[in-house]
Amino acid sequence: MSQKQTKPAAATKAAPAKTAVATTKSKKVVKKGEKKIKTRTLFNALYTKNVKNFGTGFGVQPKRDLTHFTHWPRYIKLQRQRRVLLKRLKVPPTINQFTRVFDKNTAVHLFKLLDKYRPEEASVKKARLLKIAEARAATPKGQAAPKAEKPVQHLRFGIDSVTKLIEKKKAKLVVIAHDVDPVELVLYLPTLCRRMDVPYCIVKSKSRLGELVHMRNASCVALTGVNSADSNELALLVESAKQMFNNNSEHRKTWGGNTLSGPARAILAKRQKAEAKESLAKSKI
């Protein structure tokens, strides 16, 4: 039998020990004890990173639209609900016509004219009547009393008073507020003005009209006459009022409201998109 030839122990070469230094081609070996060094990217020292924390007790919260979460007073809540209802429901033309008002420039000229004919205050009226009474009391017997002064032109207010002036065709211009509540109080005035051929206009708002007559609010005011100096200005306002309101039949036929909310429009768009996708899939079959 042939025996295997074995080399002596001295003749065998020991394997080279692994070193940390690697060749140019091989990757650098990191020892277990050493930490891996992370390379940092260069940045401009002028701009430092500022991480914000919006938790409780930390950074100031960013500005958001918190209208939906606001706890409004009751009267404001009713105003908001009424506004939304007028947008969602179908509003008939008779009520919707009160949304059409004079433009800003025309309204400024109108209120400048009306401001000249504000009714006198109670204290001024009392002083004027007292002066007339004293003059009459001072006249001796047998002499004619001093003639009363010519009544000054001024605004007339109050629904009953304005209605009577319109029926008698004494009103030169009728001004109606757009936000009268309930609207039934002035709902018939535009029709009555057109029937009696009296120029009328709708303006913002009842509080502004109330200031003219020393009241908190006023639903409507009527101008029975003006001085000769203001006659041209009144004629221009009457012409624009007739053109926009009396002779304009389009805004009396237009329905209002009937607009969906944002979420409702999004749901409808999503539904239409799904229906279109389904019909496309059926057509391919």
UniProtKB/Swiss-Prot annotation:
Protein name listed in UniProt: Large ribosomal subunit protein eL8
Family affiliation: Belongs to the eukaryotic ribosomal protein eL8 family.
A GO biological-process term: maturation of LSU-rRNA
Annotated Gene3D superfamilies: 3.30.1330.30
Compositionally biased residues, Low complexity: 1-24
Entry superkingdom: Eukaryota
UniProt cross-references to Pfam families, sorted A to Z: Ribosomal_L7Ae
